[in-house]
């Protein structure tokens, strides 16, 4: 006789519903954009009721914010994973930046993070989510390069803010001119790096 599957707890069912909504919304927002995706389409894709969406998130905007946070978290993990393959702090910084720019060309990141994020949430709320995932790791990478003598010493956090803003703009520009955006970022990074005779 087949053994019965253990019944899921209410908490497990709730988490499964929430995850299904986030997964469905992520795919649809990446494909159609926030404004082109009615809530009914999300719940249909997720296989849940409209009541479940409003119970877990309150409204479509709150669902979008959860989607944005999940996409940003995956992006930060990708950047960190790419950076870890570098042999020294500077190479890790370069590899992380390159991975960030590659990701910005993908529909999920481009549409959800760069385009709809600021317009749906407003710049301040979007920036809090975006910087929350990327600012301190970028500042830490810069600080490591400074300690290694590869970047002139200065407060790393303000420098990270400027560089993150430049990367966001480069990600937006990449759709029209990916090579030009990548070249601009490489040029910017070369200006940060100290020449061997300056060390």
Predicted stretch roles:
Residues 1-32, 36-45, 62-65:
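Basic, helix-initiating cap at the start of DNA-binding domains
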Residues 46-57:
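Short hydrophobic/aromatic patch on the recognition helix
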Residues 65-71:
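Alpha-helical DNA-contacting segments of helix-turn-helix folds
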Residues 66, 80-108, 159-163:
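Hydrophobic alpha-helical connector segments
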Residues 73-76, 95, 123-148, 157-161, ...:
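Amphipathic alpha-helical packing segments from all-alpha helical-bundle domains
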Residues 102-106, 139-140, 144-147, 161-179, ...:
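Amphipathic C-terminal alpha-helical segment
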Residues 104-124:
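Amphipathic alpha-helical segments used for helix-helix packing
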């Amino acid at each position: 006789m087949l053994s019965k599957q253990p019944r899921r707890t209410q908490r497990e069912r709730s988490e499964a519903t929430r995850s299904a909504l986030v997964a469905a919304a992520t795919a649809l927002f990446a494909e159609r954009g926030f404004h082109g995706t009615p809530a009914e389409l999300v719940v249909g894709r997720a296989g849940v009721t409209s009541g479940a969406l409003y119970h877990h998130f309150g409204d479509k905007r709150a669902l979008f914010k959860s989607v944005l946070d999940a996409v940003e978290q995956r992006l930060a993990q990708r950047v960190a994973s790419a950076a870890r393959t570098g042999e020294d702090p500077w190479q890790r910084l370069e590899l992380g930046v390159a991975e960030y720019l590659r990701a910005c060309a993908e529909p999920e990141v481009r549409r959800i993070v760069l385009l709809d994020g600021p317009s749906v949430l407003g710049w301040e709320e979007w920036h809090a989510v975006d910087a929350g995932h990327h600012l301190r790791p970028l500042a830490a990478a810069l600080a490591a390069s400074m300690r290694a003598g590869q970047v002139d010493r200065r407060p790393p956090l303000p420098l990270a803010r400027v560089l993150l803003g430049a990367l966001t703009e480069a990600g937006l520009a990449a759709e029209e001119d990916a090579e030009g955006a990548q070249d601009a970022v490489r040029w910017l990074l070369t200006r940060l790096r100290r020449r061997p005779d300056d060390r």
